[in-house]
C-alpha cells in the first residue's frame, strides 16, 4: 500500500482542498512546525551575540542549519552558504554586491527569457546603472533551448550568465551545467535560480558549475522568510556587503568598519534562526522521503494529469506532452475563459491552482500570452487530487455558458 504523505502535513487534517499550487509555496510537514516551535519554546535568544547558554544554543542551531544546507546542495564549505529571506533576496544580493562591482559599460549580462522576475529585474538594474547590455537566451514554443545559440551569445564581453534550472511556468529543466561550462570558457560567472529545482531533484552546485545558486525554504517544505545563497568562497570574499548594520562587522570606528568573516558579512541584523531551524528540518524530511521517491511520485501524478488534461477540448497546455518535461508543473489556457475565472471556479470546487503571469511576463509575452492557469504537483498530492482537478477543468466551459 502506498504511504499517504499527506498525513505528515497538518494542514490537510484541517482542510479538504486539493492543493495544487506547490510551485508558489509548498505545505509544511509536522517536523518543520515542531522545529520552529521548539526554537521559540526552548532556545529563543539572539544568536551570535550572547555568551549565556540560551544564546549559545541558538547560535548552534543556526550554524548547524547552515551545515545542513551546505551538505544538501554540495557546497565545498558552510562559509559559502548565506542565509537570506528567499530566492529574490539572494539574487538581489548577487546583483548589487557582485554585479555592480564587476560589470561596466560595454559589458554584457545574459539572461534567459524563461526567468522569474526575481532573476530579471536585478540584472536590468545592473545594466541600467552600469551601461552594460542585457541580452536574452530565447526558447522555442515548447520551452526548449538551443545550446549552439546560447554558446554564440556568450562572448568575451559577457560577465554574467543568469539562468533558471527549472522554469516556474513550463516546469522544464534547463542545461545549466552545460551553459556554466560555456560561461566559464569566456570568463563569465554563472548565476543559477534554483527555486523550482531544489524541491524536485538533487542539487550539487559544484557539479552544476554554479558560481552562485539561490533558493527558497518555503518551496522545499520549509518556513517562509528563510532562503539561501551559495556563492563560491573566492567570489564572496571580494564582494562588499549587501546590507550594513549589526553583527556583520568585526570592528567599527567613526570613519569606517572592518567586516566580519564569511558568511556573516552578508547577514546584517538579527537573523532568522527559527526559520533556519525549520529549513534544516525540511531538508532532513525531504532526505528521509528520498528524491527517488519524490521524482517517481511527481512523475506519475504529472503523467496522469497531463494525459487527461490534453484530452479535454479547448484546453491548451504550455510545453511538451511529455511528463518528464514538466517537473510537476502543468500550465494551461482554456479557450474563452480568463485564467482568473478558471482559478475562481476551481477554488469553488476545492481545487487550489495559480492564475496570472506567474512573475514571468516576458516569457508569456514571448509565447503570445498575457496570463495562464497553473497546476503544480508535489509528492504528497494524490490521484484523488488529480481526479478533482480534471473533473473541475472538464466542466468549466459548460459552467461558463459555452456549452460542452
Give the positions of each predicted feature.
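Pyridoxal 5′-phosphate
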Residues: 1-404
Amino acid at each position: 500500500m502506498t504511504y499517504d504523505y499527506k498525513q505528515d502535513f497538518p494542514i490537510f487534517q484541517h482542510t479538504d482542498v486539493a492543493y495544487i499550487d506547490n510551485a508558489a509555496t509548498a505545505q509544511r510537514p509536522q517536523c518543520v512546525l515542531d522545529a520552529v516551535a521548539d526554537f521559540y519554546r526552548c532556545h529563543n535568544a539572539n544568536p551570535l551575540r550572547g555568551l549565556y547558554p540560551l544564546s549559545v544554543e541558538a547560535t548552534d542551531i543556526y550554524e548547524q542549519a547552515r551545515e545542513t544546507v551546505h551538505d544538501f546542495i554540495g557546497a565545498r564549505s558552510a562559509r559559502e552558504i548565506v542565509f537570506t529571506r528567499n530566492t529574490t533576496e539572494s539574487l538581489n544580493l548577487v546583483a548589487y554586491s557582485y554585479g555592480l562591482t564587476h560589470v561596466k559599460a560595454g559589458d554584457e549580462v545574459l539572461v534567459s527569457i524563461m526567468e522569474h522576475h526575481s532573476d530579471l529585474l536585478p540584472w536590468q538594474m545592473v545594466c541600467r546603472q552600469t551601461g552594460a547590455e542585457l541580452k536574452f537566451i530565447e526558447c522555442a514554443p515548447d520551452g526548449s533551448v538551443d545550446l549552439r545559440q546560447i554558446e554564440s551569445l556568450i562572448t568575451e564581453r559577457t560577465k554574467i550568465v543568469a539562468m533558471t534550472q527549472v522554469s516556474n511556468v513550463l516546469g522544464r529543466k534547463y542545461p545549466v551545467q552545460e551553459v556554466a561550462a560555456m560561461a566559464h570558457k569566456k570568463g563569465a560567472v554563472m548565476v543559477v535560480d534554483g527555486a523550482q529545482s531544489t524541491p524536485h531533484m538533487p542539487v550539487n552546485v559544484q557539479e552544476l558549475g554554479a558560481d552562485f545558486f539561490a533558493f527558497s525554504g518555503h518551496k522545499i517544505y520549509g518556513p517562509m522568510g528563510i532562503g539561501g545563497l551559495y556563492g563560491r568562497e573566492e567570489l564572496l570574499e571580494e564582494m562588499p556587503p549587501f546590507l550594513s548594520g549589526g553583527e556583520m562587522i568585526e570592528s567599527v570606528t567613526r570613519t569606517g568598519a572592518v567586516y566580519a568573516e564569511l558568511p556573516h558579512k552578508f547577514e546584517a541584523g538579527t537573523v532568522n534562526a527559527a526559520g533556519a531551524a525549520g529549513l534544516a528540518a525540511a531538508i532532513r524530511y525531504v532526505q528521509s522521503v528520498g528524491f527517488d521517491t519524490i521524482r517517481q511520485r511527481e512523475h506519475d501524478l504529472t503523467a496522469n494529469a497531463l494525459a487527461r488534461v490534453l484530452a479535454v477540448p479547448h484546453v491548451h497546455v504550455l510545453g511538451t506532452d511529455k511528463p518528464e518535461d514538466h517537473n510537476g508543473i502543468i500550465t494551461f489556457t482554456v479557450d474563452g475563459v480568463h485564467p482568473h475565472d478558471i482559478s475562481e471556479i476551481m477554488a469553488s470546487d476545492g481545487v487550489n491552482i495559480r492564475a496570472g503571469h506567474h512573475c514571468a511576463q516576458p516569457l508569456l509575452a514571448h509565447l503570445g500570452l498575457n496570463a495562464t492557469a497553473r497546476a503544480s504537483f508535489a509528492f504528497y498530492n494524490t490521484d484523488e487530487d488529480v481526479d478533482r482537478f480534471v473533473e473541475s477543468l472538464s466542466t468549466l466551459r459548460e459552467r461558463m455558458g459555452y456549452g460542452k
